[in-house]
Amino acid sequence: MSDYGLLIDMDGVIYRGNEVIPGAREFINALVDNKIPFLFLTNNSQRTRLDIATKIQRMGMRVTRDHIYTCAISTAHFLARQGKDVTAFVLGEGGLMSALNRNDIAIVDKDPDYVVVGEGRSYTFEMLEQATNLIINGAKLVATNMDPNCPTANGGTRPGCGSIVRLLEEATGRKAFDLGKPSPLMMRDARKLIGLEAAHTFMIGDTMETDILGGLQLGYHCILVLSGGTRRTDIDNYAYKPDTIIDSLADLNIEILEQLMAKKPHHHPALPSC
């Protein structure tokens, strides 16, 4: 097995909507063939790992659900570490509910330890009102992610999980704890899940604010792809920079990954004394 591995965003990196991005199929299958460990990371809490893996398989990539790590799973793992008999009131759908159930988090309507917010299309004002009062009365607010919006299948945009969380923050005066990208908890747990050291980890994504920021904060080698939401001219607007920039996964292969890893320092230089 390789001594390095990858964390890979999906939308804008391997596909756009239901269309595979050129080069992605060949790159992902090469990782599988060469037994290079990798996980797909997503801030989509609606869909289960099986749902996501099935979509990717239909695009010709030989992956399984074990290659998928969602913000819903990150959230469920965090809650499970908080002790026994943890309870949650949930604003969310199938993927989030499944992850919580698999980690023995009891879903309740009264006196929860946490209010957990994920994406959803079935919110009602009454549900938001109930969540507001539960938080005011002591439940802790947890966000599966803070993405402000989400793309729709017809090319439009709808409010994302972060928009709902902001509403609850404003209504209650409480701040949410975010467990999606770029949360270090999610991105560190994903790395550990496939047995990688930080210095041997690539993060590939198309979004500066989540994929690249989160990876840089943990010392990963960050590769920005320009096949999604970021243009080359956008990069100068940020105080931080990716380690590598490519147009798409068509510009990346195993040989290039090994060259990049060979050039990456495996320790940070000592800081000058003040």
Positions of PLM-derived features:
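Asp-based, Mg2+/Mn2+-dependent phosphohydrolase catalytic module
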Residues: 1-10, 15-34, 45-69, 76, ...
